[in-house]
Amino acid sequence: MLANLFGKNGLNGSTASLSDSDSGSSSQYNSKPSSQYGSPTSINFKDDTSSILRPISGNILDHMSDDLKSKLFATKDLISDISLAYYDPKSTNSNINISPDSFRLLLTEETGQMVCRNNYRVVLDYVTPKGSYIEQIRPSELKEYIFGSPVRSSDSLEVDKIRVIPNSNILIISRTFHVSSKINRLAICLCLPSYYLPVVMEAWRQVSTWLDNTQASIISIISRLKKPPSTLHLQCDKELSCLLPADARFQFVSEFESIILALQRKIVPCLRSISEIPRLFLYPTTLMKFVELWFKDVFNWMELKDGPRMNFLSTLLAIIIVNFKEELKSSESTRIAIMSGNMVVSNKLINIISGILEPKYKGPLLHTDEDNELSTKLEQLDSIDTVNTSSTEIHMIKKTNSNSSISVSPASTKYQNSNKGWEIPRRRSAHSVASISSGESLAEVIQPSSLKSGSNSLHQLYASLSNNYGTSYGSWFNKRPNISQFMQYSSPSNSNESWDRAASIHRTNSGNSIQQLRAGFGITPQQSPSISEYDEYPWFGTPNSPHVENSATATTSNTTVSSASVPWTTKSITEPNRMYNVHIERDFQRISQTELLDDAFDKICKPGRKLECGLTVTPGNMIHAGVLEIEILNQDCVEKSSELLPRYTSYLRNYNSWFKLQAFPANNESESKVITSMKKDLSVYSYSKALLISLSTRDIKEVTIKKEYKNNTQDTNSFKLIQKTARMFHNGKPQANLSLELNNCILLIESTLKRASELLKPIQSSADTSTAMTQEARQEELLKLFKSIIYFKDTKT
């Protein structure tokens, strides 16, 4: 076997590489043995220290509008604990120049002496990438953290330790164990960047499983090397009864390779994913603003994606409520995967789905004053227009010696000022513009020469199509509008002068961009869709375009264009359809509860503050000091939200098996990736379940995989996997084999949505208020309707 691994020459200067299909990387083994025990191991995987990976979620948030960020994450300023300084290879501070993929693995063993300064030796020391800061810590220092006191311990208990080395930003995870006898202790030590500390316990099942497998491999190696008792006794003086030889890493290359590959391809990616991917915030059901927006998002989806006859969304919500809601909350092997080529549409569906999932946040929400924020924004807008008009103008019309600007009608009561998402870039010397499609991460489009005009700032706009309204059209739209369809809405008297730059509207692989024409409505631009996303993206000016609901007015110096006369839907900026008045202090994984702790402490200990709960004082005695017992099981402390958010996330560029709700690009291997991860779950769990949603084909599948043991035994080597796939929605209609409970839930959702649409009509239109319900009664009934949906299984008889 060794000859096959290292070639015909065995260990004499030859190398061998093994590839893995999952990562596409190769591993090499250097045959030259180490001269001392403390040096790194001979196993040397290919490391490219120059290509340090960027944060996983970097582009996800950059391409997301402020409105969508507020709905998904309850904040616009989502900040990770992992600073970008960690990823800067040019950083001079060695304490922070640690790649997120860096780790160090040590396998150490005691030498059998009771009291000795060097009563251990290093059997394996593997570091990646080479030359990182983790490698600079001496093994003798790590030994102090692993074994502790130099006095040998006769305790045979298995001990797991987690600690951070002071002033080093390095986290140590170690396991100390004995084999069969109490001769020597062995230790597995894993060194990681310290910013993984908050997520280690969340991923402890995966880490503990890797430690168990590593320990089993070491015990297997020792059992294969075990000598007869007489031979072991004769070598005690020379070998000091060591269980592992010094060259064990050369004798058992495949075993040590599997240990390192499992660490490199499972544990480190798991920790990195959990720490770097932002998680959704589940709004409480008591927040009326969220309930209204949730219903509006549902109606937008059903009108623009499902159509009048397709009940795709109601069926999907019913399946999640009946079959997945409780399991997602309690099981780590249940997931919902949305496969789509469009990031914006997928995130809007995730926003709808997250509204019915648990566990919801039960703590207090920090609100900002809407009126003050509105007045501040309007004052800022007025001051910008008066002080520096040229900085806010968007030249839609080319006119000599004239600054034609677009202004928002003063009748507006709200103005969305976005500073995230796609923004107008700064003026550059090169007038080419990069248009990024949702299917292409960095696709630069060479613009025509007509854009290279310094007198017009139109070339500064990104070619994009805003999907900020929660609208998205289905595949039944037959054609995309051309430029002539937009030119017909301009004034005839100004056609020669006002639209002479119409040819300079950006052209991308998705067709003509109309974002320039909508720039005056305060909408955050989004990326333009590619040709492959045509069936999932809204195209305006088509026969089935929805009616215009509002009449926001855009005014130029020569003509006034009303939103009622343009071929696209323009929601008035007066409509309260934003979550900007809610802000949560949080990072990527958890909610900050500092204010809750401070408030609880003030209630108990602040002088002069009335205590709202009972207390009991136990006087001190010779045994203990005085004790103050406080009854905290009151209304303020019951059912508080946990700090850690569930592993639900938004659209990702690649499928991530450690998140239970996500969307990712659709391709030929999308379903196989999910099923493969489900099978891997069965190494820890006995049951795995997934809901596969394809937006391009409008298919919903429920896949379950479970273990079935042979002969009714729990032997891990005598079981088979049973996979069942149920098609729940296909060809635009639910399947006939749905359960009675599912059908009842679908009917409930449809009737509830019908009633909710009637309640929301007075809010969306200027109907007669004499017969309309009061605002309080309407909100109360909307809240009851929403709770009847999400608590269907709890209230059904």
From Swiss-Prot:
Keywords: Amino-acid transport, Protein transport, Transport
Domain uDENN FNIP1/2-type, first and last residues per copy: 98-285
One GO location term (cellular component): FNIP-folliculin RagC/D GAP
Region feature (Disordered): 16-43
PROSITE patterns the record matches: DENN_FNIP12
Record field: compositional bias (Low complexity): 16-35
dDENN FNIP1/2-type domain boundaries: 690-767
Transport in keyword set: yes
Taxonomic superkingdom: Eukaryota
Function recorded in the entry: Involved in extracellular amino acid uptake. Required for the protein trafficking from the Golgi to the plasma membrane.
Protein's name in the database: Protein LST4
Organism: Vanderwaltozyma polyspora (strain ATCC 22028 / DSM 70294 / BCRC 21397 / CBS 2163 / NBRC 10782 / NRRL Y-8283 / UCD 57-17) (Kluyveromyces polysporus)
